């Protein structure tokens, strides 16, 4: 019998209320006198809580190698709005030296604070196309965290038991047939529902789900989306069908289901067969049940007419360096990021501890450690990808769309009203 870690209601509560995780490296205070004057403190504020512990551990190693540098990391996520939290940091005068931004929309919001990073080793090593979203002329305004992909993550053993071959699922009709088969065998499979749709999370539906249907409209180009005055919902009917399918066969009430419950309570404990998520969930699933994570987790593309068999793969976040910091601190921040992505210690952590798909040259990609990331890397290498255009949405428009999707699911808004209101809000934000 496989051993499973008990699902913690405390963890769930933290995720619902939002997560703000602060960590300090081992450098500590420098004390008084000359040592204090020589000490450089780098405060890092970032929005990816999944690797917070591993990131802090790596920062401590950097401090050991560089005793003149003290690194403090604050990770914000869960139900907390990262960008609002970042803006609060700047308005309060507690500006971080390094912070994360997601694509051109956020780069534009913080443009006055962005240091040109084109002279870094990391920028030189970045894979082709990974800097496009944060390049302005000759300037590189951010360095990619990693590559990520998402889709329909499924339980391999359940599919096999239900007689479903995942390789035969390409179209929406194929998927619907598989979902109905799983639903008809819920009792035999021991599941509560086929899906766990966390409709409480606006980003899951308004950013990730919607993106696969908007990407063809903007030629899979985040900058085309960023510069677009309007949006047409050209594949709106497909988007509606996919949202309806997930909701109809989901644990209910989906509108009160959050990310933590979806991943930890339902998928990791094998109470559902499919969830819409990405490779970033792997550390959480592994922590809950390592045997399940290593052997029974796969990923399928969300079906899009004309782009069947393609996964959305992109750069979720970029590191930015605060240009308002003093010259020594800016250089120290650049040095840390270069060490993170180009040193042997950093590269090992990126692959094995962070479990990232690297966005830089010089990595042994055969060592990508988790099965979801391996599959995503294979899709990317084969060119079977869909662009991440949601990073080019007008500021907070993904939340607007997500809120409208919530209204649609609660019968407070028709799909036609959803499209009309969302188009109106896009156009208003572009003025």
Predicted regions and their residues:
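Hinge/lid segment of periplasmic solute-binding proteins
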Residues: 102-151, 294-300
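Short helix-initiation/N-cap motifs at beta->coil->alpha
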Residues: 75-85, 172-174, 255-269
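Extracytoplasmic/periplasmic substrate-recognition and gating elements
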Residues: 60, 64-65, 70-72, 162, ...
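Conserved C-terminal helix/tail region of periplasmic/extracytoplasmic solute-binding proteins
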Residues: 160, 184, 344-347, 359, ...
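Conserved N-terminal structural module of periplasmic/extracytoplasmic solute-binding proteins
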Residues: 2-4, 8-13, 17-18, 24-106, ...
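Glycine-centered hinge/linker elements that transmit conformational signals in sensory
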Residues: 179-180, 224-257
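Extracytoplasmic/periplasmic solute-binding protein
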Residues: 141-143, 150, 176-227, 272
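Short amphipathic alpha-helical coupling segments at ligand-binding clamshell hinges
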Residues: 54, 58, 238-245, 327-340, ...
């Amino acid at each position: 019998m496989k051993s499973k870690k008990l699902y913690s209601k405390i963890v769930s509560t933290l995720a619902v209320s939002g997560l703000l995780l602060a960590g300090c490296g081992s450098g500590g205070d420098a004390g008084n006198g000359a040592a204090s004057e020589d000490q450089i403190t780098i405060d890092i504020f970032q929005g990816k809580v999944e690797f917070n512990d591993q990131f802090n551990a790596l920062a401590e190693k950097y401090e050991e190698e560089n005793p003149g540098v003290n690194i403090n990391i604050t990770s914000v996520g869960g139900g907390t709005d990262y960008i609002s939290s970042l803006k609060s940091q700047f308005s309060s005068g507690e500006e971080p030296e390094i912070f994360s931004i997601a694509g051109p929309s956020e780069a534009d919001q913080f443009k006055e604070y962005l240091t040109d990073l084109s002279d870094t080793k990391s920028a030189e090593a970045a894979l082709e196309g990974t800097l496009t979203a944060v390049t302005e002329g000759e300037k590189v305004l951010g360095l990619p965290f990693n590559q990520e992909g998402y889709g329909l993550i499924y339980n391999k053993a359940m599919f096999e038991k239900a007689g479903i071959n995942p390789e035969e699922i390409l179209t929406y009709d194929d998927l619907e047939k598989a979902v109905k088969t799983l639903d008809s065998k819920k009792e035999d499979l021991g599941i509560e529902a086929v899906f766990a749709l966390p409709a409480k999370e606006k980003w899951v539906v308004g950013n990730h789900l919607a993106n696969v249907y908007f990407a063809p409209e903007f030629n899979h180009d985040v900058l085309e989306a960023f510069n677009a005055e309007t949006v047409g919902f050209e594949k709106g009917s497909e988007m509606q069908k996919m949202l309806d399918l997930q909701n109809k066969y989901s644990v209910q009430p989906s509108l009160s289901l959050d990310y933590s419950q979806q991943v930890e309570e339902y998928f990791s404990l094998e109470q559902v067969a499919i969830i819409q998520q990405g490779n970033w969930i792997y550390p959480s699933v592994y922590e809950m049940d390592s045997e399940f994570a290593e052997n029974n987790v796969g990923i399928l593309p969300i079906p899009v007419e004309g782009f069947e068999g393609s996964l959305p793969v992109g750069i979720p976040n970029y590191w930015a360096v605060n240009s308002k910091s003093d010259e020594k601190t800016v250089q120290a921040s650049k040095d840390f990021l270069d060490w993170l992505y180009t040193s042997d210690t950093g590269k090992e952590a990126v692959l094995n501890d962070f479990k990232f798909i690297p966005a830089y040259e010089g990595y042994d990609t055969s060592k990508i450690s988790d099965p979801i990331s391996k599959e995503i890397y294979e899709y990317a290498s084969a060119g079977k990808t869909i662009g991440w255009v949601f990073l080019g949405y007008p500021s907070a428009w993904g939340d607007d769309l997500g809120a409208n999707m919530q209204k649609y699911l609660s019968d407070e808004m028709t799909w036609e009203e959803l499209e009309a209101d969302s188009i109106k809000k896009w156009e208003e934000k572009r003025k």
